[in-house]
UniProtKB/Swiss-Prot annotation:
GO cellular component, one term: proton-transporting two-sector ATPase complex, proton-transporting domain
Keyword Translocase carried by entry: no
Site positions (Reversibly protonated during proton transport): E93
GO MF annotations, alphabetized: lipid binding; proton-transporting ATP synthase activity, rotational mechanism
Recorded name of the encoding gene: atpE
Description of how the protein assembles with itself and partners: F-type ATPases have 2 components, F(1) - the catalytic core - and F(0) - the membrane proton channel. F(1) has five subunits: alpha(3), beta(3), gamma(1), delta(1), epsilon(1). F(0) has three main subunits: a(1), b(2) and c(10-14). The alpha and beta chains form an alternating ring which encloses part of the gamma chain. F(1) is attached to F(0) by a central stalk formed by the gamma and epsilon chains, while a peripheral stalk is formed by the delta and b chains.
Ranges annotated as spanning the membrane: 39-59, 86-106
Keywords of the record: ATP synthesis, Cell inner membrane, Cell membrane, CF(0), Hydrogen ion transport, Ion transport, Lipid-binding, Membrane, Transmembrane, Transmembrane helix, Transport
This protein's record includes keyword Transmembrane helix: yes
Function: F(1)F(0) ATP synthase produces ATP from ADP in the presence of a proton or sodium gradient. F-type ATPases consist of two structural domains, F(1) containing the extramembraneous catalytic core and F(0) containing the membrane proton channel, linked together by a central stalk and a peripheral stalk. During catalysis, ATP synthesis in the catalytic domain of F(1) is coupled via a rotary mechanism of the central stalk subunits to proton translocation.
Family: Belongs to the ATPase C chain family.
Organism expressing this protein natively: Sorangium cellulosum (strain So ce56) (Polyangium cellulosum (strain So ce56))
UniProt-recorded name of the protein: ATP synthase subunit c
Membrane topology field: Multi-pass membrane protein
């Protein structure tokens, strides 16, 4: 596990450790507020887009780097490497777009 992934994981875990106790110790009266669920839906939609964009860009970057490394080692195989790389990039991008659609539907559940 690289240092960058360890730092990313510790940032996510640290954020969860800070936010979870505050939600667990919330008052009972605040749970009946109708705007509370709507605000968490908006936060969830924002996190969905952010995490999907982060994962998609990391996946696309690694796929492109591996394909370019393969082409640089064997330039004759460029045609055989390029087509699966483009297909893989399209599938990665479709997952990001799917998360965008889900976030859009979550925004539609928020009552004004």
């Amino acid at each position: 596990m690289s240092l960058k992934s360890k730092l990313s994981l510790s940032a996510v875990v640290g954020t969860a450790l800070v936010l979870v106790p505050a939600m667990a110790l919330a008052q009972d009266g605040a749970a009946s507020n109708k705007y509370d669920a709507n605000s968490w839906l908006a936060v969830a939609a924002g996190f969905a887009i952010g995490i999907a964009a982060l994962g998609g860009t990391m996946g696309q970057g690694r796929a492109a780097a591996a394909a370019l490394e393969g082409i640089s080692r064997n330039p004759g195989a460029a045609a055989r490497i390029q087509t699966p790389m483009i297909l893989g990039l399209a599938l990665i991008e479709s997952l990001v777009l799917l998360s965008w659609v889900i976030a859009f539907f979550l925004q539609g559940k928020i009552a004004p």
